From Swiss-Prot:
EC number assigned by the record: 3.4.21.92
Annotated protein name in UniProt: ATP-dependent Clp protease proteolytic subunit
Enzyme class: hydrolase
One BP annotation, GO: protein quality control for misfolded or incompletely synthesized proteins
Keyword vocabulary terms for this entry: Chloroplast, Hydrolase, Plastid, Protease, Serine protease
GO CC field: chloroplast stroma; endopeptidase Clp complex
Listed InterPro entries: ClpP, ClpP/crotonase-like_dom_sf, ClpP/TepA, ClpP_His_AS, ClpP_Ser_AS
Family, similarity comment: Belongs to the peptidase S14 family.
Presence of the UniProt keyword Cell cycle in the record: no
Summary of subunit composition and partner proteins: Component of the chloroplastic Clp protease core complex.
Its biological purpose: Cleaves peptides in various proteins in a process that requires ATP hydrolysis. Has a chymotrypsin-like activity. Plays a major role in the degradation of misfolded proteins.
Superkingdom of source: Eukaryota
Length: 196
């Protein structure tokens, strides 16, 4: 039986009584962010807003982004990645469950040395794709060109952030490549694997 988003007590500094707020708002106050769904414009804008706001509260306290996502739209994912690079605080990324497709791109975007995977987490990388649709040939060519540009961006970032040669990353992105947490560490997507 679904119960909705759980509520937890929270006391604002200087107040005597506690208020009940949803658990995510409580965790946000501790700089703990969650990406637990498909990446689209809405969740991208929410995470970007939270990162920018929290970075204005403190430029030195790290942000923690917990990821359990099957991936999603490329441009909103790149927007999250770019914001992670832009904000002053380090963004620590934590893979719990699955970081696939754009989820793995965001995972690799965490501060190098501060990217972690839980021991049974899975990571998957592949090239960006678009759904086939019926269109004029000119539109199809333009979409293919845009996909090639996006693939080049993703490949360059993965290579830079993992330390792997561009050709290795490019070959890996030709198909869905699933990795265990330990394999993701060897691949350079995460720096540490948590121990239970």
């Amino acid at each position: 039986m679904p119960i909705g988003v759980p509520k937890v007590p929270f006391r604002n500094p200087g107040e005597d009584s506690s208020n009940w707020i949803d658990v995510y708002n409580r965790l946000y106050r501790e700089r703990l962010l969650f990406l637990g769904q498909d990446i689209d414009s809405e969740i991208s804008n929410q995470l970007i807003g939270l990162m920018v706001y929290l970075s204005t509260e403190s430029e030195i306290k790290d942000l923690y982004l917990f990821i359990n996502s099957p991936g999603g739209w490329v441009i909103p994912g790149i927007a999250i990645y770019d914001t992670m690079q832009f904000v002053r605080p380090d963004v620590q990324t934590v893979c719990m469950g699955l970081a696939a497709s754009m989820g793995s791109f965001i995972l690799v975007g965490g501060k190098i040395t501060k990217r972690l995977a839980f021991p049974h987490a899975r990571v998957m990388i592949h090239q960006p794709f678009a759904a086939f649709y019926e269109a004029q040939i000119g539109e199809f060519v333009l979409e293919a060109e845009e996909l090639l540009k996006l693939r080049e961006i993703l490949t360059r970032v993965y290579a830079q952030r993992t330390g792997k040669p561009l050709w290795v990353v490019s070959e890996d992105m030709e198909r869905d490549v699933f990795m265990s947490a330990a394999e993701a560490q060897v691949h350079g997507i995460v720096d540490l694997v948590a121990v239970a």
